[in-house]
Design a protein with these regions (language model features):
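Short alpha-helix
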Residues: 101-116
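Short, glycine-/aromatic-enriched active-site segment of Class I SAM-dependent methyltransferases
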Residues: 80-99
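C-terminal lobe and adjacent flexible extensions of AdoMet/dcAdoMet transferase-like proteins
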Residues: 115-147
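Conserved SAM-binding strand-loop segment of SAM-dependent methyltransferases
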Residues: 8-30
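A short SAM/SAH-binding and catalytic strip from SAM-dependent methyltransferases
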Residues: 40-54
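A short acidic, Gly/Pro-enriched loop at the edge of an enzyme's catalytic core
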Residues: 24-42
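Short, small-residue-biased leader/transition segments that mark boundaries at the very start
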Residues: 1-3
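A short glycine-rich, Lys/Arg-flanked "PGG" loop and its adjoining helix->strand segment in the class I
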Residues: 57-72
């Protein structure tokens, strides 16, 4: 356990460096970065919108894979009221500003639900949009649920 882990007062906490898109990437001993069913809770703050749409299904499968049987999620991210068009998705300034990769709000819950997550709800959802671009509303939400 690293010093940082001990300093926060928990003995079951570990900090790992890696890409959320590659939780299943194998190390030199052929072990994934994070083992199956080894995580109690996944907390994420504005990370998933930075994952390309092509990589999202793998990302979600890995989130489910690493959570234990009582695992929970609390994911704060940016969603949109309309699907973000490809020309905006390809705008690097909007991508780094957490806009281009915003999840279409109805898909955000349904994509987790399709993988078997339960008790999904928005613990928080901003009433007012954070940004509006080309008549697309972008807002913050916090999705909670469990396996």
């Amino acid at each position: 356990m690293c010093i940082r882990d001990r300093n926060i007062g928990f003995n079951n906490t570990e900090f790992l460096e890696g890409s959320i898109e590659k939780l299943d990437e194998l190390d030199k001993d052929l072990n994934p970065l994070i083992a199956d069913k080894s995580v109690d809770i996944i907390l994420s703050n504005c990370v998933l919108n930075l994952v390309s749409p092509e990589s999202r299904s793998n990302l979600l499968r890995n989130i489910k894979r690493v959570l234990n049987d009582n695992g929970r999620i609390a994911i704060s991210d940016i969603v949109s009221n309309k699907k973000v068009p490809l020309r905006l998705q390809n705008d690097h300034d909007l991508w780094t500003g957490c806009i281009s990769g915003a999840w279409y709000e109805p898909d955000f819950i349904s994509d987790f639900k399709e993988l078997g997550f339960k008790n999904l709800e928005f613990a928080e959802r901003s009433a007012e949009p954070w940004k509006v671009i080309e008549d697309i509303e972008f807002r913050t939400v916090t999705l909670v649920g469990n396996i």
